[in-house]
Amino acid sequence: MNASDLWNKSLDILSRREHSVIELKNKLIRFNPDPNDLKDVIERLITSNFLDDKRFASAFIRSKAESGYGPNYISQYLSKKGISSDKYDMYSLEIDWEEKCLAQFNKKRRNKEINFKEKEKILRFLAYRGFSYEIIKNALKEFD
């Protein structure tokens, strides 16, 4: 696959969803392992504004927050995808993390009374979903 085909393939991949630079490199390397072609295409995508780690991070954060994940989970996943924390600000996107946490809590408890053991189980679930202790504590003040 030459550089032109690699360019077209990368546009095809990016037309489906946002990707990080590292994520796209890993996908494209299967089609053309030549590092020079790959580097040229990636640089061209970045300068053409087709590929942007900040835009990817913002879209990813919004998507995962809407799916009920907390900031700790999201930042850990982004670092796995090669996005450094200086590329995004989790708290500048006007996401109410306490509201998201409370929504997940209510979804788990199904609007019924719960005992201490069930509450602890839900709190562990919320921590697993990436909500910090502080967010959980603030979101669930009314249930103490």
Where do the language-model regions lie?
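An alpha-helical, amphipathic repeat domain used for nucleic-acid recognition
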Residues: M1-D144
